[in-house]
Amino acid sequence: GAMRRAAGKFLTVVMLLATLGALGLLGRELVQHFQWCIQAETVRFTESADELRNPDRGVYAIYGFRIKEEPVDYAAELAERMKEDTDTTLAMLQINLQEYRGGELSSAALENIENLFRAISGTDKRWIVRFLYDWYGENEQYEPQDIEIITGHMKQLGGILKTYKDCIFTLQGLFIGNWGEMNGTRYADQESMQQLTAQLLESTDETTFLAVRTPAQWRKITGTADIAGADGEMTRRLG
C-alpha cells in the first residue's frame, strides 16, 4: 500500500512537470510570435507652448452675407475678409434671407448661395452655418408671415446643403428668431418648431448635425413622437 501511494505521487509529479514543460514551450512560442508581429518605437516628448490646430474647436469669427439678386464673387470677398483669420479652425457663416421673406428663393438667390458654399468649402475651416431673416433684433418685421415660406426655403436649399455637407460643422437654429437665435419669433410653439426641425432634417445629409439655442427648446422639439418616423432621427442629430 505504501509503495503504491509513493508510485502514485511520483507519477503525479512527473505529469505536473511534463505539463509545466509543455506550457513553457507554448509560452515561449507565443512570446516569439507576438514579438514578431508587434513593433515598438521609442519616442521622447518635450513640452511646447505652440498652439495646436485641433479641429472643430476654439474661438471663431463671424461672416455674414445678405443674399440678393445681384451676382457676387464670394470667393474673392471671403478671401479678403478672412485674410487675418489664420489661426482658427472654425468659423460662422450667417446667411440672411430677408429679401425673400415674402416667397420662394429665386434662381439667382440659389446660385448666389451655392457660390457662397463653394467659397467656404475652399477654406481650411469647418463652418457653423446659420440661416436667418433678421440682423437687427426686430425679427417680427422680417420673419416670413407663413411658416410654409420658411419650410419652402429649407426644401429649396436641400441640394446645396447636401452637396457641401463636409464643410458644415453644424447648422445652428431653425431660420427663425432675432438674429436667427430662436427668440422673439411667432414660431416658438412646439408644433411649429417640430415642423421646422423635421423639414431641416429632411433637407440635410444624415451626417449633418443641427443645433437649437436652449435645452428647453430641445426638449420641446424632441419630447413627443408626433412626427411619425422622425423622432429617432431627430434625437440623434439635434443638439
Predicted segments, located by residue:
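N-terminal Sec-pathway targeting helices
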Residues: G1-T19, L23-L26
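Membrane-interface motif at the C-terminal end of an N-terminal transmembrane signal
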Residues: G21-I38
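Boundary/entry segment of secreted carbohydrate-active catalytic domains
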Residues: H33-L90, Q94
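Hydrophobic faces of well-ordered beta-strands that scaffold small-molecule active sites
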Residues: R57-A61, T89-L93, W127-F131, F169-G173, ...
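Aromatic-lined substrate-binding rim segments of carbohydrate-active enzymes
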Residues: A75-D134, I147-I150, E202-T208
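The substrate-binding groove and active-site-proximal loops of carbohydrate-active enzymes
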Residues: L97-A108, G137-E148, G177-D189
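Active-site groove signature of glycoside hydrolases
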Residues: I128-E138, L157-Q190
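Catalytic-core regions of glycoside hydrolase
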Residues: T170-E181, T185-G239
